[in-house]
Amino acid sequence: MRKNPMDVIKKKHWWQSDALKWSVLGLLGLLVGYLVVLMYAQGEYLFAITTLILSSAGLYIFANRKAYAWRYVYPGMAGMGLFVLFPLVCTIAIAFTNYSSTNQLTFERAQEVLLDRSWQAGKIYNFGLYPAGDEWQLALSDGETGKNYLSDAFKFGGEQKLQLKESATQPEGERANLRVITQNRQALSDITAILPDGNKVMMSSLRQFSGTQPLYTLDGDGTLTNNQSGVKYRPNNQIGFYQSITADGNWGDEKLSPGYTVTTGWKNFTRVFTDEGIQKPFLAIFVWTVVFSLITVFLTVAVGMVLACLVQWEALRGKAVYRVLLILPYAVPSFISILIFKGLFNQSFGEINMMLSALFGVKPAWFSDPTTARTMLIIVNTWLGYPYMMILCMGLLKAIPDDLYEASAMDGAGPFQNFFKITLPLLIKPLTPLMIASFAFNFNNFVLIQLLTNGGPDRLGTTTPAGYTDLLVNYTYRIAFEGGGGQDFGLAAAIATLIFLLVGALAIVNLKATRMKFD
């Protein structure tokens, strides 16, 4: 009797078994749980929450048959959440804090650092280290009285207290040299030497022991007292520092470093619009960023469209060669082209200035004059961007029916009329979304500015470092990493948040304007 094919049970391989699948998922779940707990214990709450959400969603999707379709979407969604949304949330969160090079620690860690500081209080003793078989002996000498003190033999390892006795002479044997002391510096730092009178001394330099005491003492009300000067300090959660207090309880001028991170609310955002040293360069840089992006988009589209029309011209011979030559700037990595142009535009030895000097007797100051520096940026960016627009236009030109040009030729239209009446209107509509994307890209064109001008020439009289060719993204970078008064990550994050809102608003306005124009 012939078996029904439906009755045949498909044999599973060992790697397709449910037991193996659930075992692997269980191990992954345990590993993720351990990592989340570890992150939470270290105070990295945002990382812990993100890891928990992404991992839980992934385990559910790949364990549940009903969510099979989501397996194709999950990698893209997880990537977007991890590399787009997570950095965005982190940036916005930092914008509401005073996080900077001077305020990186938590309050507890900053307090620990201050309490670990000590000051030298008491006599200074010269010390020597002498071998005693497999062990060592510590010898101290008082330079004022000439007395010598000697410890019993000991071995290095961990914190230990050595009782010293007065000795008439130094131990026999060769004194350890500086190399040996340097190699055992950490172990020597853990030794507390107790003198016959009960005073305790510790290593203060590579050749000396001295009496040390904690510089600060933590009082019951949370204030720190300087044991050397008697000044009291209280945590000021408005600025994130321990700050001195006067006798009447008011804040003094002295602040203790390191500081700690606190929430400052909208302070970083208000600084952008109220601090003249930040407001003036910010507004000027914003205007220049918009102008730079608009001019770049206009020139790259114009040059790319015209060249695309020329290389598509039927009467032109050798079109393939021209296409290859015109696309070459797009094939060369942009950072290489930018550095080559930086050499060509060199004010003293660049080929461009040599040629202009020979022809017209002028040598423009490409890097020291704001106007010529901006002109140079637009020239270089047009060179880098037109091949992309040309490739797009070459493809879109194929979609325009030849009947339109034949009909216009019968009406006596010329090449310019064909371009402005037929080609341009039919190309501009499909190009609009790409032009908006190009605008957003050039709005944040960090690499061009950083490699070609580094934002220069610099503006004078500003609170933060700013240059005439800086875009907003470069301005943010300089505040975060190149500030002369320290790296202000909170202010940089606030400006980055404003850039995000500005680019988003401009994109929405452009899309709505385009929709109104073509509807």
From Swiss-Prot:
Keyword Transmembrane helix recorded: yes
A GO cellular component annotation in the UniProt record: maltose transport complex
Pfam families per UniProt: BPD_transp_1, MalF_N_TM, MalF_P2
ABC transmembrane type-1 domain ranges (all copies): 286-510
Keywords recorded for this protein, A-Z: Cell inner membrane, Cell membrane, Membrane, Sugar transport, Transmembrane, Transmembrane helix, Transport
PROSITE patterns: ABC_TM1
Entry's transmembrane regions: 19-41, 45-62, 75-97, 289-311, 324-346, 375-397, 418-440, 489-511
SUPFAM superfamilies xref list: MalF N-terminal region-like (SSF160964), MetI-like (SSF161098)
Compartments where found: Cell inner membrane
The keyword Cell inner membrane is annotated on this UniProt entry: yes
Function: Part of the ABC transporter complex MalEFGK involved in maltose/maltodextrin import. Probably responsible for the translocation of the substrate across the membrane.
Family under the similarity heading: Belongs to the binding-protein-dependent transport system permease family. MalFG subfamily.
Record's protein name: Maltose/maltodextrin transport system permease protein MalF
Originating gene: malF
